[in-house]
Amino acid sequence: MKRYFVTGTDTDCGKTFVTNQLVNYFSNSAAIKPIASGCEYSENQLVNSDALLHQQQNHLSLEIINPWRFRLPVSPHLSAREDGASIDVHKVADYCLNLQLNDIKKLFIEGAGGLMVPLNEQDTWLDFLKLTRIPVILVVGMKLGCINHTLLTQEVLEINKIKCQGWIANCLDQDMLMLDENINTLEAKLKYPLLARTNYGGKISDICLSSL
């Protein structure tokens, strides 16, 4: 089973939407979101709205999709602390590397927030990637400032020798000024391919998804 880690340029860049689009596109694929904050109680258990969306796609249990759940809608390390818990990055890494799902050929692992979001007082998603070496798919939320955020993310990945499979342009605003020019700029400056583009509220448009 191939595994990919889906991270983004920022919170609310559209990782969940794009991840679900990838699951729709590829047969025999599934998605999980191992860590989520901002969960609410439903039927005596904490539930995350993003995990519920993945469940609708996957028909997997929430326990498989989202084993680490916390209440407050803040950074995972703070939300876990408020719940009297802590996140062990080694356990998260082991879970994502060893999870086996029948008939699933591609597993998309959605992170919480961006690459440098703290999971505890020492570790970030970058440390998770150093442990797992799972290749990254970068979701770029197309908005003002995305070029800077994207190039900074690329630099961190490069310095730490983390493989990036490619990036996806997620068009958040149908009225964004010079949208195509921004995408062209990123294509020229990034060292990995544009895999796909999602137009505002629309389906994913394949550009280079066959490389996954």
Swiss-Prot record:
One of the GO BP terms on file: biotin biosynthetic process
Protein's recorded name: ATP-dependent dethiobiotin synthetase BioD
EC numbers, comma separated: 6.3.3.3
CDD domains cross-referenced by the UniProt entry: DTBS
Residues in coiled coil: none
Family indicated by similarity: Belongs to the dethiobiotin synthetase family.
SUPFAM superfamilies found in the cross-reference section: P-loop containing nucleoside triphosphate hydrolases
